[in-house]
């Protein structure tokens, strides 16, 4: 498939496209710390067969795009300490950036972020310019769904439709549910694995908590699916978390969006519970919502047919 590097906004963005570029474009934006290989071919090919041109790309700081963040101070220090002290340091760091209820808070680190979601939205729009794409159906997962909202707010003329998947209107909203305690513990353990250089194990540990009950986590299959993702370029130290924390909550602005919008969310999402997706749907006028029962913070391959059918219907009606 055609692929390349777009030099935009003083960084490089790696991209790959599928299908006839004269067809309507679907722009796929992945979530935090995840490169575009997590949009699998099995998800992309049916969209191409339905008559769409599909573009996936690596956000800044992951994959083959420019990495602006490398290993952080806490990680470097933790490597030098005994395991028990490293675990205490990591627990302390998580307590600094979360409140008593498990909400991520705007930390000092976030206030010094090198970029925010508006910069990442500009990357996506600039990539469209580079590829000669005027408008696209914008689909984003998790943080990618947040970038999708920013495009709808700040660059509405570039979007044919919006689809935020397992996403949120923003952090720090006291009316919305928080992460589960089990996920927070899983994140701490994953961070320890990353420090020890066990990056794949770190990803596995997180996804065990993110997977819902409908399709139980299969570690062997997951590791096999993650091989191309890890080989493409996994940056566990990306600044995506800081970018989310440095960005304003969009909930009060969602009413400004006047684009066909489909919100997709699972009922067992441990990091961004269902009410985050519902808040997006409630905030954007005339939006639709697809609720995936028993699904966590994931797009299970078992639901590809159902999800893609709904997406194609959404795109064609836009």
Segment roles from a protein language model:
Residues 11-107:
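Conserved HGGG/HGGXW glycine-rich cap/lid loop of the alpha/beta-hydrolase fold
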């Amino acid at each position: 498939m055609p692929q390349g590097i777009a030099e935009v906004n003083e960084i490089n963005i790696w991209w790959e496209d599928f299908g006839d570029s004269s067809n309507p474009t679907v722009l796929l934006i992945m979530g935090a710390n995840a490169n575009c290989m997590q949009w699998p071919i099995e998800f992309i090919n049916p969209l191409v067969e339905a008559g769409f041109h599909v573009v996936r790309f690596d956000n800044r700081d992951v994959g083959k795009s420019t990495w602006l963040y490398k290993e952080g101070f806490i990680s470097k220090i933790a490597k030098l300490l005994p395991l028990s002290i490293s675990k205490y340091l990591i627990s302390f760091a998580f307590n600094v950036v979360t409140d008593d209820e498990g909400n991520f808070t705007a930390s000092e680190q976030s206030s010094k972020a090198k970029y925010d979601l508006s910069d990442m939205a500009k990357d996506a729009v600039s990539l469209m310019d580079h590829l000669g794409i005027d408008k696209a159906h914008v689909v984003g997962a998790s943080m990618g769904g947040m970038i999708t909202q920013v495009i709808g707010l700040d660059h509405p003329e570039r979007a044919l439709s919006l689809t935020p998947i397992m996403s949120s209107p923003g952090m720090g909203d006291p009316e919305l549910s928080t992460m589960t305690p089990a996920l927070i513990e899983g994140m701490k353990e994953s961070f320890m694995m990353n420090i020890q250089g066990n990056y794949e194990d770190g990803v596995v540990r997180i996804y065990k908590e993110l997977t819902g009950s409908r399709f139980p986590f299969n570690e062997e299959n997951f590791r096999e699916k993650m091989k191309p993702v890890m080989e493409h370029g996994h940056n566990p130290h990306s600044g995506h978390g800081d970018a989310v924390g440095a960005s304003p909550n969009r909930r009060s602005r969602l009413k400004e969006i006047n684009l066909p919008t489909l919100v997709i969310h699972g009922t067992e999402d441990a990091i961004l519970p269902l009410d985050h997706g519902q808040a997006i749907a409630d905030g954007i006028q005339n939006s639709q919502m697809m609720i995936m029962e028993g699904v966590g913070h994931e797009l299970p391959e078992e639901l590809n047919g159902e999800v893609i059918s709904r997406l194609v219907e959404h795109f064609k009606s836009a």
